[in-house]
Each structure stands twice: as C-alpha cells, then as structure tokens.
Amino acid sequence: MAGVPPYGMHSPTQQPRYPSYSPSTRDRQPYSGNDPYQHPPRTPPSFAPPSSLSRSPHFARPPSPMNTTLPPLNGTVVNADGSPPYHGHSGSATSGYTLPRPFGGSLMSATSHSPPPSYSHASGSHSHPSNIPDSFSQSPKRESEPYDVRSDRTGPVSQTPARPASPKESKSARSNPMSFANILSGPADEPPPRRSSPPPQTYKSSTLPPIAPTPKVDKEPLSEPEKRRGSSHYETAYNEMPHRPAMNGFTPAKSPLAAMPSPLSKSRKLVDEEEIDKISRENIARALEQIDALDNSDVEAPGFEQEWERYMAKSRKRARELDAIEGRKRKRRRTEFLGKLAKMFEKQALQGIERFNRIHEAEVQMEVQQKEIQEEKERKKDMQRKRRRENTVRHEMEKLNAAQKKANKIEDEAEKQKLAKEIARSKKKIKDTTLALERGEASQEISEVNPLAPNLEGGTTSSFHIRTKSPPPPKKRAAKGTSSRPRKSKEKKQAEKDAAEAAYAAMENEDLVPLAPKEDPRKTSLKKESKAARSKEPSPVPATPYDSKGYNQFYEQLWRDIARKDIPKVYRIKVVSLSTRQENLRKTAQLAAKQARKWQEKTNRSMKDTQARAKRTMREMMTFWRRNEREERDMRRLAQRQELELAKKAEADREANRQRRKLNFLISQTELYSHFIGRKIKTDKAQDSGDATTTAAIEGNGEGKVPDSLVPLPDGGAKVTSFDDLDFDAEDETALRQAAMANAQSAVQEAQDRARAFNGEENKMADFDEGEMNFQNPTSLGDVEVSQPKMLTCQLKEYQLKGLNWLVNLYEQGINGILADEMGLGKTVQSISVMAYLAEVHDIWGPFLVVAPSSTLHNWQQEIVKFVPDLKVLPYWGSAKDRKVLRKFWDRRNITYRKQSEFHVLVTSYQLVVGDAQYFQKIKWQYMILDEAQAIKSSQSSRWKSLLGMHCRNRLLLTGTPIQNNMQELWALLHFIMPTLFDSHDEFSEWFSKDIESHAQSNTKLNEDQLKRLHMILKPFMLRRIKKHVQKELGDKVEKDVFCDLTYRQRAYYTSLRNRVSIMDLIEKAAIGDDTDSTTLMNLVMQFRKVCNHPDLFERAETTSPFSVCYFAETASFVREGPFVDVGYSTRNLVEYDLPRLLCSPEGRLDVAGPGNNKAGFEGRYLSHLMNIWTPENIRESMSHNDAFSWLRFADTSVGEAYEVSHKGVFERAVRRRDYSTRLSLLDVAYDAEDGVNINSVHVHSLFNIVERNDRRALADITATGYMRELLNVASNVAERGGIRTIEPCAKPGASAPPITISCSGQAAIAEARATFFNTAVRHALFAAPTKAMEEEILSNKLDPAPYSLRPLLPQPGSMKGRYTNITVPSMRRFVTDSGKLAKLDELLRELKNGGHRVLLYFQMTRMIDLMEEYLTYRNYKYCRLDGSTKLEDRRDTVSDFQQRPEIFVFLLSTRAGGLGINLTAADTVIFYDSDWNPTIDSQAMDRAHRLGQTKQVTVYRLITRGTIEERIRKRALQKEEVQRVVISGGAAGGVDFNARSRENRTKDIAMWLADDEQAEILEQKEKEALEKGEELGAKKGRKAAGKRKRDITLDDMYHEGEGHFEDNSTKPSGAATPVSGDVSGVPGVKGRRGRGGGGVGRSKKAKTMKERLRLVDGEVD
C-alpha cells in the first residue's frame, strides 16, 4: 500500500510529532543487516481524524517527513512500484508500540548466520518488512499488542490479512532486475514511471464544492474473507474504507460518511439483511427529499465573503508557518535518524566486509595468482606468436626477392606466370602477417549468429558480432516468434507425417525406400497410396503369419544380409549426403552474412578510416617531436661529454707528465746509486761466466751510456731534498736531476755510516778512506779479490768463488743483496762461505741468523757442520720450554762473537722468528740469511714487517725464483733489502707491477729503454746465474709435454660440470669482483682438475658382495674376547627346522638302545645278528652249495670281508678302499702283447672282466687332446699361462646363505651336531687336514709326516679357485683405463722401468697420491712417499732411503712439500702428473733432481689433458716464465706476449680457463670491442661501494689440500713444519685471538678452513 495512513484526530495546530512508520507490504529481497534487532522503532498509525476536520478547508496535508527519493544506503535498487523506501512515522509524540528488544530471545534468530523468520516475506525495497496493516490505528495510551513470531511473519497477534494486489497493478519491468529491458538499459536510465494515479484536484478558496446527494447503494452479501475481517477487533467502517492512491506522498482524508461509525455496526449479525437494506433506502430517500426542499444552505448564504477570504488567508499563513517549523524539525530529526542509521549500516558493512575478506581471502589470492600466471603465459604466447610472424615475414621477403630475381632472368612465359603467382602469394602472406603484427592479434573472422531478441525500441540490434576466442553466449528464446528457425505450418507437419508413414508402409511391403529428393514424385505417390489405403481400409484385418521352419530361416537370412550389407551402405550414403548438405548450407550462410554486412562496412569504413588516419598522423607527429627532442638532447650530452673528455685528457696528460717526471727522478736516483755500487762490487764480473750471449747483451746495454766519471755531480754539501718537497709540475728537470744526485750520494753515505756504526770501535771498515767513497772515483774500491776461506772443507767452483767475492763486497759496502742463482747451483755453500770468510779474515764469528723453511732446517744444520766444522750451530726449534732453554746461550752483551762463544750460527724457521720476534730484535745480528726468500714476497704480511725490524748489519736473500707471479713480488724483495732507496712509493710500485705487465696486454713489444733501466737497477742488488751458463758438466734438462685424452667417463663428468654452470655468467660476475664468486670459481677449477686427474676422486668404485641372508655372531664387547676372536661356523640361516626335543633324543630313535627304548636291543639282536644273512656261517654254507653268495669268488672277496662290509657304512668303506689298488694294470706287464694287437687274458681273474686292464682314472687325465681337454682343464691352463692360481668367476650370486639346519632345544642334539661337524677322523679323511694334536705328536716324536699325509677323499672345491669368496673388489685394470693420464703413465712407467730409470712423481693433490699408491701396489713397483703429512724425522729418512736404495723405482711427492731443500739426484726422470699454475713451483720441484751431483740427463715429463683447463693453465704458466726471462735474465723483449691481467681481473682470468677455445676467442673479441668503446666487459653501471675485502683465497690453498705449510705462510701447525714436540701455542707474543683474523678455537660456522671447505664441496662432510 502506497503512502501513509491518515493523521490522528488533532487540530491543525496539533500536528503529530512523528509520522507513523508503515513500510510497504511488497515482497522484499533479503539483505545483510535486516535482522529484527536492527529495525528502527516502528510506531502504529494513529486513529483517523473526524470527518469534519478531514473535510475542513483549513486542514492542510503536510508533506511526508521522509524523503520519498532517498537513495538506499547499501546500494540496492529502489522499490519497483515507486513507493518511497522510507515512509513517514506517526505523528504521536510517544510511540504506541514498545521498541523491539535487540537482544531478546523472542526476536533473535536461531544462529548468527541464518536469516531471521521474517526473511520468508522479504521486501524488494530498503524498508524493513512489516505485516501490520496500513490502516491500523491505536490510541497512544493503549498498550501495544504482543508480537507473533512465526516462521513467515512478525506482527500483532490479531491482524487483518494484507490486501491482495489489484489485478490492474502489474509488476513493472523495473521490479525484475534480470528482465531484458533492465539488462539493455544503462545504470543512468530514468526510473520507470509510477503506476497511474488520478490527476490532482484543485480546490477553490471562495466557494465550497456542493455536496452530492447520497447515492443508493445496494449492498451485496459479505464474502467469507469480509466476514472474517469484520470479526476482528478493528472497526468495520475503517476496515472497509476504500483505499485511494497517494498523491504527492500524502494519503487523502476519508470521506465523512466513511469516517462516521455506522449505527448498525454493532447489530449487524442480529438484523436481517433485507431489513437493513430497506432502512437504508428509506433514510437515503428521506435525506434527499430534505435537501431538495431547502432553498439555500448555510454555507451558500451571502454576506460572509470578506470574512471567508480573511479566514482563508490566515489559515494559509498559519499552515505555511507550521509547515516551515515542521519542516525544520523534520529535517533535523531526519538528519539525526539518518546519521544513526548510516553509522549502524556502516558498522554492519565493515563487519560484513571483514567477514567476507576473512572467508574469501585465500580464494582470492589463489585466483589472483592463477590470473597472473595465466596472463604471463598469454604474454609469452603473444611474444612467440609475434616472433613467428616476424620470421614468416622475413622468410617470405627472402622468397619474394628470390622469385623476383629468378623471374627477371627467366624468359619462359609459363615459368614467369608461375613465379608471378608465387610472388603474389608471398605478397599477400606478407601483407596479412604485417597487418596481424600491427593489430597485435589474429584476424577475427565474422561468425554467423542468431538474430537477437527485439530491444526496447521494438527493433532488433543492428550490430554484428565478431567471432572471438570466448565461447558464444547461450541462446535465449526470442519473444514474439522471432526465432532463428521458422515455425512449421500444420500442412507441412502433416506432410512430414505422411512421408514417414509412406516410408514405413514401403518397408512393410519389403521394398527399399529410394533416396529421393525433397519433391520426388515417388514420395508423393507413396503418400497418396497410403492415404487411399488408410481411407479404404480404416481398420486392416490382422493377417495370420505363415509359419514354417524353412520360411523362418530364409527370412532371418535375408534380414542378416540386409543388416550386414545394405544398411551400412545406406547409412554411409545418408551421412555423406547430410554432411555435404550441411557444408553447403554453412557456406551459403557465411556468404549471405558477408553480403548483409557490406552496407554497414561501407558506412562505418569511412569514419573508421578517418579516425585511423588521424590517430596515425598524431602518432607520427608525436614520434617525430620526441625523436627530435631526443636527438637534440643527445647532441647536447655528446657535446658536454666531449668537453669533459677533452678536459680529462688534458688533466691526464698533465698527470702523466708529472708521474713521468716523478718516475724519472726515482729511476735516476736509483741508477746513480746502482752505477756506483755496481762498479764497486763487480756484479757484471760475477755474472760474466763465459757465456758470450750474456756478455754481448750486457755490453750492448751499455752502449750510448755516459761514463760515470763524466757525470756532473753536486758538491758534497748538497742538500738532500725530500720526495714530498719536490716540484714535479715544472717543465725544467734540472732541479730534479740535481736532487736525484744529492739523494743518491746521501744514500751511499748513509749506508756506509750505518755499516761503520754497527760495530762501533771494532768495525773493520774504519780502515777505508772516507774520501774515496764518492762519485768522483767510482772504481777505487772494487779491487778487493777474495780467495776461498781455508776453514771451508769443500772446493768452490769458479762461479761460486765469484759469487763469494760479490757477497763480500756487498758486506764491506754495507749493502744488502739478493742471491738469485738458479736452483742447484750452490746458494747454500756460497752463503756458508761468506760466514767462513768473516770468521777467518775479520774474526767475526757471529752472531749469524739463518731463517729457512722448516723443511730445510736439518739440511742447513748438516751443511754448516759438514762444510765449516769450526762454526757452532744452534738449532732453534722445539717447544716453548726448549726454546727458553736455548735462549740462555745467547750473548746479548757482545755485539761480535768470538770463536769461544757458545754458538755462532742460529738456524730457525720463519714461523718461530715471527713468534719470538721480541727476543730476536734484542740481539744485533751480524748477518741475516733468508733462505727461500719468496716467503716474504708480500710486503703487507706480518712476517715481512717482523723481519724488516730485525737489527742486523747485512741481509742476504736466497731465492731461485725472485719473480713467481708478478713484478710486485720482486719489488717487495727490493724494498726489503733497501727500505730507504726502494721506498714504498705508489709510482715506483706501479712502474714495476703495472707498467711492464699492462704494456704486454696489447701484445706489443716492451719498451726497450725501460727494460734497460730496469736491468741496470737490479744489477747491483741481485746476482742471477743459470745452470747452462756456469755448469758445463751438468747434464741437460729435457722437458716434454705429454698430451692425454679424456676417457668416456672423464668426458661425461667434464661435460656434466660444464653444463651445470654458465661460463658467460661466471665471467660477468667475475668482472664485478665479488669474493663469493672468486671462491666459487676456484672451487670449479678444483673440480675440473679432479676430473682431469682421475674420476675416482669424485666417486670410488664400491666393493660388492652377495646379500647375506643369515644371522651373524654377536658379542657384548670385543675387548673381553681377546686379541683374536674365532667365529667359525657362527652364521645361521634365517630358515630353521624346529624339531621337538623327543625326536632328537635317544628315546625318540628306534636304532639307539637306551633305558627309554626297549625295542632297540631286541631288533639289534634278532634282526641284525640272528636273522642276518651276512653272517660268516651263512655265507660259507651258501658258497659251498653254489647258492646266493657264490659270486664272491669272482669278486676276490673273502667271507670276513663281506661280513665286515655289510656292517659298515659308506664312509667307512670309502676310507677302507682308499688304500687299496687294483691289480688289473699288473696284467699288462705280465702279458705283453705286440703293438696294435689286443690279446685278452683267459685267466680266472679276468674271465668276467669287461674293461681294460687299467686302473680307473679321472676323465681329465684320459683326454689328452681336443676341445674336451681344454674344457676339463681350465684351471690348470690358467695357472700355466697366467701365473696365478685364481680364476675370476663369470657371475656372482645375488645372495648367499649357510645351509638350513635343525633347531632343537635339547643338549643331546647340540652334542650330536658338534660330534658330526667336528669329527676329527672324518675331517682328516675328507680334507687330509691333520689335527693339532697329530701335528704336535709328529713334531715331538720327530716322525716322517708322509705316511700321515694321505690323499683327501674329496677334491678341491670350485670356490677355492676364486679364493673361497664371492666378494668383488673393483678391477684395477678398469681403475687404470678410467683415466687418460693414468693409462699414459702406465705405459710410460713400463718403459722407464725397462730402461733402468728412477722417477720422481709430483702431484698437486694428496688424494691423488693415495690412488697412485694403489696403482703402484697393483703393478708391484717399489715406491716411497713424501707429502705434507710426513713428519720431519720420517722425511729425512725417506729421502735417504731413496738416495741409497736403487730398488726403489718411484718417489711420490707433493709439489709444495717435495719442492724445497731436497737433494734427489738419484732420480733422472721427473713426471708432473698435474702442473702447478705457478711455473716457479714446478721449476723448484724438477731441480730437486737437476742439480749439482747429477751425472745423467734429466728428462721432465708433464702430463696435460688435451682440450681442458689444464692446457690453458699451462699456457698461462709459460707466459709467466717469459716474464722472468725478460725481466731477470736480460733477454730480448721482442715479441713477448705477457697476456697479463691486473689484480682486479684475476678472477676473470680464472673464469677464462673454464671456457673452451671458441668461447675464449669470442670473449676476447668482445673485450676488445668494449675497451675500444671505453667500457669494460660485463661491468655494471651501478656498482656497490666495495667494503672491506676478505682475505684473498689463492689457488695455492685450493690445490694443496692436506699438505703442510712448508713455506710457513701462516701460524697453523703442520706435521712437516718446525719440529715442535710441545705446544706451539706457548710461543710468546702469539696468543690465540678470537674473532676475525684469530686462529683461536672459537671459529664460527662461516669461518671454515680451506680443507673443510674443499671437503664440503667434494661431498665428504655430512
């Protein structure tokens, strides 16, 4: 019901405060928040006003306090009937109904999620459902009616049923949101018009409308619902009052007649209906007559016009004022109410959102993820489709060009036309593909669709659908007969039925139905015949079927033939026809659709083309301007960049000139110093040892040089200028040259002063004249000639004597030096001779300090004692307590020791010098000798700094390889010997390490001038001789590279490793310089080298054995069992036969007599003796009568033997027969026959003999030749040919188990089993194994064991040839062939063994040495081993054994452990199984054999795997050797390719080793191109700031895992390090630090040692 009920009976001044709330009774849709406790307070409507007030003209109907068009708060649509969603409230000040309790039990829903009972009558609007009648009114003082909470409604207990909807009120389209009109209309459509209402009535203010006479109403009898309604407690007049439609949101007042209570309402049931009608008609007629009789009414009387107008004006004014006041109040109330409602709705909405999110969050996330994955897949598909189209366009363009060229050359017209077709086809394909590329999707073809239903305007939609990938929408049934298929008429349907009946009739007549067309005359005739037959015979008479056996068989045969042959054929024809027809119809429909669309395409194409052209023009214009702006911006940036580059270049040139002047100053200063010192100590003369090439080179280097005497020198009082105070920006270099001369003179003077002041008054150098030590006469002090000291027990060679002179001159000048003779030329003897010279000539007996690697400490001690017995040697090593005792012999009071001193020479290691530095620095040492000085190659190490702080007069460095890796190491040695001259300037360091090496990166020649200057600087401080120049009697050294190939297993491993890593990514990461990547690269290098050495370094072949299905012996503790545990016969099968104890006891045995078995004795007596036929008496009687035993005389058996045999078992008879021999072979001797004639004997012994007269032999002995002999004598043949008695079986069983035994709990069964298994006599007879007691008896009685050693009855088992085991050990033959290197080494060692050579075999990995030991054992080669784990005392004995025992063929050594301080001249062959990346390490190792004392030619073999990382490492080592030759030896620098890389690119260099030749060539080419553009390969723009770099992990640590630290690069203890018996931790000054850099126990998990890291990589750590 629309509108609100009438207001209460109040005066116009007493308007209701709150209008009544009456929601619509239409069906409402349920929504959240519609629970009863959420409804606003509802007030019942007030009573209807009286008729006088209703009809009063002063009564103005105020508008509804609620806005009728208030939008819904939760987004739902408004009511379909146009009624306002929120209706007015009652005008009473207090609510007539009590508010529903929000938490009451009667109105609360069953569950918090289930809808309340009122949801059964849901409303379509936003108002809350209510079943209170619209006309319900109640007094404000009246108590509210109780609510009835039921399953379908909520309201008062007694309630009038709702008024049914009017038949004229139809449900609008708006009320159905799924209607076609709602779907087609947009969200902004106007609301549908409300249902029709009567036009508004206008009232005149001057005159009142006349009252019409009361019409006659014929009352009809009340219906049953009206009766029920009348029986309610509401007034009948009000219930029966007709409802008028609302106008402007108000409900008009009731008519006076309707409002007045009828006097007959109380007695309606008592009065008859006829009397009521009669009284009503009479009253009405009487009232009409009275009205007609009146002339004028009171209202129509004149004279009240002005009063009426004044009254009406005041009424209108008052009404307007009241409306305004009420409007403001109403607005305020509405605002307040809506605010509360909005807050409540907002709270409910938020709770609903949270609840919805909580429920559907996971589902939404999954859906979004799936959507993203699907979008990513679609994007990839689009990219693939785009690439395919681009490739298609490119291929078609190539085909098009080729076809055009071919068409231009061909003259044949037919070929030209054919090519023209191909060209047109290619152009079309290119065009289509290009259009598809521009559109970004495939061409969409127009699909045929069914016509749509008519829209709101009455027509059909004019748009055409384009076929897409999405499935077509489901077909809807069109309205008003506009379906896609035309409806059939009745005639057509009847015709189809007739046709079907005709076909059925034809089939009944056994006539085939022809496939006739649609209008076939045959079909028409059939129809007519069927109709005529149907008309003539409306009810056919049923025919009696003919039944016979032949007929039925023939009938069934016909149907089978038809079903087998004709029906499939007809079906196929029908299917083909149908498919052809459908195809034709489809094509026709497509053509028709295309034709129908042409008119639309013509109209839309021009507009689309215009828009497309405009967009394209705009796009091109924007592209042009963007490109133009970008070009201008790039030009500006290019100009700025060029300016910056020019400025940088100018600044770089200025800085280069400054650095050049600075470098020239340093070199000039060093050259002046070197020239003077070199002339005095005669380095050239010491180096000149008869080699013409070297002499010529030296002389050539001196050409064009100004003599020293002509060099202008400053005065002696010239001021020394500090390096920082010099001005290197000035163009004039005169001041720099003068400063260099002054500084050089000062350095010489300072060295002399320091040497003189070291010993004070005892200084022997005081005899020299100070005036001679200047640059004016540089040759005055070089005339000192030194002869060999007498106390030296050996004879020095010529070059060694020259070296002694050079060392003595260095000492007398107070200058330090480097003795860099090649290994094996006697550096140790020369340094010892210097100490002997000082003791003999200058009476300086010490103290001398010799620091050497721990592996050579014993060698130094032995050499000093051997060559100079007068010098006392103090070996300083051992525990902290031992060293403390040794320090008591130190004499700190005397600077110079005498002959009577406690010691003269102290020999110690680098490790202990650094550890006890505080004690060593308190003593002034006369001479400090550092052996293997490459140990201090790093100027940043604590060892270098500690040794530099020692107080010593002179320092001497001994090294065979002054340059190992780069020039930086040589500079560190020079800086150590001359700290003041070779100061740690960055420019000087860069010139040594960077300028020379980086010069060779471009593969150009080295600067000859700089190289000459370098040689000139090094000459005074370093003496270098080579073996081939100074030692003529020493044999040559021949180096050979032996290339090996990868085996199949190695190649598989190598390829697998290469496939797991990306070489390009590694090189790009290496360019960044990350420490983690460096460690990863080194690990990869290690893995690749392992593959090249032997694949068993990754995975060893396992020892296999059959699966043992048995129980093994168990013991609680092997400690209690003694040293030897015999567990023979302890295994038991898992399957055992359990027997009762009775069966295994004597009581259960029938043949064993006992107290429990009485029958056994009876049977033994009677059956075995009395009734036995084998008794002697019975046998003898039978033989006398020629009965049963008469055959014994032919068997040569007596009666006693027959009786004995019958009472013994098989085993006893076999043992007895073992000693007997047949006499058949004797007949051959007694009766010889001629050759070839077989004469049989006729004696009694051989009357029944059917075999030859020979003893029975084994079949293997009878067959002398043929295949049978080979098969029967396999074991003997193998033993004869192979020299071994074992044969490998062809197959191994998969499982093994001991025999199944009987299990019984009785002791008797156990004793019987033991007696059976371990019967001494039986075992001796079967296996010929004498017992222990028998052997002791034979030995004690000194008997001959031959009679007691009988032939065993059982032959040797077959398992003895396989050594009684099924355990399979990995084949050593396969072990050798699995590695290409090992296979090549096997051949090489065989040749060397036959040639009488002895071999030194060097390895990089100790695990490979373990494998090599297995190989040498397999080949029976005698060997000895020395690696990092060898103790010092064992090391000395091992070297001595190899030198003195010629039968030792191979010496296994680790390159680092066996390459220092060892004399192994007994070997003449050196084999490097894997080369070191540092060539100097290999040179030291091979010089262990190629040194003084070697009389044979030394051959060096280097095994290299072809095409692997080893080949590239070898190339890199050759480049390093070339650096040493050029820099140190003074050779020509032409064509030298250092191919050196800077320190930053070391990781990239390692990564290049992993690439093959093609990849390396590509990478080098890319790097060159990148360098030309000014950018580095693989470098990224945004590099992170490098923090503290971790400790560099060198390849030395990676390669030499498990070896000792013989170079003492760290304080880690080693088995081959300094022989410390106690704790090294007792060294003062070296405390266990925690944290970074500390070697304490508290190492974190990340701070793993290199060995642990490698084990982790190799998979050896769990």
From Swiss-Prot:
Q: Where is the Helicase C-terminal domain?
A: 1384-1544
Chain intervals with Low complexity compositional bias: 109-130, 1619-1630
The places in or outside the cell where this protein is found are: Nucleus
Span-the-membrane segments of this chain are none
Q: Which segments of the protein form a coiled coil according to its record? A: 356-439, 581-671
- Top-rank taxon: Eukaryota
Basic residues biased stretches: 474-491, 1580-1591
Mind listing the UniProt keywords for this protein, alphabetically? Activator, ATP-binding, Coiled coil, DNA damage, DNA repair, DNA-binding, Hydrolase, Nucleotide-binding, Nucleus, Transcription, Transcription regulation
**Compositionally biased spans, kind Basic and acidic residues:** 140-153, 216-229, 390-399, 408-425, 517-537, 1592-1610, 1649-1662
Q: Which CDD domains match?
A: DEXQc_INO80 (cd18002), SF2_C_SNF (cd18793)
Which residue stretches does the UniProt record annotate as biased composition, category Polar residues? 11-24
Residues in domain Helicase ATP-binding? 808-980
What the protein does comes down to:
ATPase component of the INO80 complex which remodels chromatin by shifting nucleosomes and is involved in DNA repair.
Q: What is this protein called?
A: Chromatin-remodeling ATPase INO80
Q: Which organism is it from?
A: Coccidioides immitis (strain RS) (Valley fever fungus)
